[in-house]
């Protein structure tokens, strides 16, 4: 949103210093540069493991002001729902995501305030781990 003009200084044929200014330009507007790079998920796709969202390959010629991440899950690979409260770069895989795919939704804001939303590739279906049963066994004798 700046304007520019040119200032030219020169010495004329009579040894006089001359200064000329151009007219101001129109306001220069930001052209949104595309975000380059990918959001990548690292880790084992199994209950009890931790996945990590990697955003370090993302770049924007306008500079990056912020990157926020959120995790989403899907049972069918088409309909995605947010995992409430999961807004950090790490996701602990618990029973709630078993049988689902997960992906990262990254919201990047550049230094001009332009927001870009990117999604990682979805994981494979999160595997279940057979949890060890807990509790006590009670055996009663039933007689006739």
Ranges and model annotations:
Residues 1-144:
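Ser/Thr/Pro/Gly-rich low-complexity disordered regions
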